[in-house]
Amino acid sequence: MSISPSHFDEDGGNEVHIRVAANEEPSPVHPRSSWIRFGISLACMTALLSLAVASLIGSVADSAETEGDAEQTALMSTANVFRVAQRRLSKSTASNPFAGKSFYVNPSYRTSLERSISTAAGDVKSTLESMRDIPSAYWLDNKGKITGSTTDSMEGILQDALSKPVPELVVFIVYDLPNRDCHAKASNGEICCKYKSDGRCDYTDVTDGQCRAGLKEYKEEYIDQIAAVLRKYSGQLPIVLVIEPDSLPNLSTNQDDLRCGNSATMSAYKRGVSYAVKALAAADPHAAIYLDAGHGGWLGWKDNMRDYVRTIRSLDVADHIRGFASNVAGYQHLGKACSTYDYCLGGQHNDDECCADPCGLISEWNPSQNELNYALHLREAMSKGIPGFIPHMIIDTGRNGVAGMRSQCKNWCNVRNAGVGHVASTATDVPDVVDAYFWLKTPGESDGCTQILPDGATCPRFDADCASQDSLGSWPGEPRAPEAGQWFDYQVKQLAQFANLHLSETTTLDPEETTTTTTAASTSEGESTTDSSSTSTMETIAPSTGNPFADKVYYVNPSYKESLSTSIATASGVILTNLEAMMDVPSAYWLDRKNKITGSTTDSMEGILQDAL
């Protein structure tokens, strides 16, 4: 399949993308092409340039001080301050893809819940009944789930969501890399770099060291098939994709595990994720893509986060993604956001709500002890590590409604006394960073099996972590857990028992938009679970809404470059360096004479507009 080329201009280009902070998202009715501001005052140009340079100098200075990396310090030169990474972001990265949308609820999930409702009673039954109308993601964890006509397939789900009076937003988890789940066994996948005789993956056999056969299977039989479905529905309904949970975080922290650190697995993960992002972004430019970013209890330490940033930078995918998904299939508490990075470390501010630390991570010098703090810290690290990239986050709240239910935060499998958390909502605590809370892991689906399955057979994918003291099935009298992804009735009833849904404060709309809100999650018919007359719909924002400079690529006039070239020819030293850097800095064009309006060259308004278009 053909993949669209990199968004960077090969020759340096005549466009520079400089991020300008905005209180509101830009209007979706404006196309993401180059914007031109025709100045009538020199102050406009001066203010814009001053703001961009001041912001860049400040961010680079902070980065050099915080990270101490030579690569960051090198950015301090004046020329490099001007030469910001040239990013042309796709439509999918322009604004919050969840804002103003009705969210899809899968009938197949409702059917699973109905089985548990039939044997439940009291408050647990009532909560399970409420959960039937709460949207969640659908996992594409094997090739058989891509095509089809039922809501057990990606294609069938998209057709169903498109059939609603208002097409509904669907979230898919892309999860089928070769040598999947290298640091655990519970979710090992169907595609391998090297197959054993029983069809399972041999993680220790690196074969050619590149996983060529596994990657070929992944690309042609999995990603390309998803891409074909996306092309069919592109632009017809909103789609969000979360790419390969656990994969890149494992490469950042678990290379000592030979299953993760061998050359075949590393190649499979890096090349596979890079291909998936670029192929799926090309197939549906409207789809919003988020990469998995583990969680604060995994990558929250500065060294771990730095390694993860370097991994992302090496893939060159920042142009194609909206940001990152955290806590996918995890139990990390949402918490409250702190005002500064190290606010809680060293025993400071222990009484502040944002420093609540149910896992004891702060004592281990991890400042990302909750997922909101982690979102803020990851965004800051990414912005410094990849200049021009300002990612947004979504947080999995499917099972993090309870804090402090684990003896150790590293325990991840079918955690006892967990509760479902915040229902799908864009009313997040930090809306400029976190796009949405969403149930990414389907509550009720097992994380992994006990050593003996419910039917008495030995589980072939048993992971010792699923026998931890915090895992359901490890205590006498508890039922055994089924394999990962299978329905676990006992677990979903506990999740309902300890639920913390935040129904009274939920909206499926951006809180800054003046549209109808709901007091609960949207159903598949776009209805609230508490008020059937209140629905959320996609809405067009008026052209005057929001900062017109935010998230735009700015035009640099070739005529201005020609003028600068005459001065560059006679300059030297620092002046020459700075003049060369100014060649790629956008500025306004003055319509100070009538003959500058029409024409075909970039010395006219008409010619400039044609060139920018």
Describe the role of every protein-language-model region.
Residues S118-S126, L299-S471, A569-T577:
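Surface-exposed substrate-engagement region within the catalytic domains
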Residues S102-V105, A137-D141, L169-V174, P238-E244, ...:
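Structural recognition of the beta-strand scaffold that forms the well-ordered cores
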Residues V60-K91:
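N-terminal, immediately post-signal peptide pro-regions of secreted/luminal proteins
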Residues M1-R32, L75-M76:
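Intrinsically disordered cytoplasmic terminal tails of membrane proteins
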Residues H30-D62:
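N-terminal signal-anchor transmembrane helix specifying type II single-pass membrane topology
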Residues T93-V229, K441-S471, W475-E483, L495-H502, ...:
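N-terminal carbohydrate-binding/catalytic regions of secreted carbohydrate-active enzymes
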Residues T507-T508, E513-T540:
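Extracellular mucin-like PTS domains
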Residues E168-A283, A288-G300, L613:
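Mobile, glycine-rich extracellular loop/lid and propeptide segments
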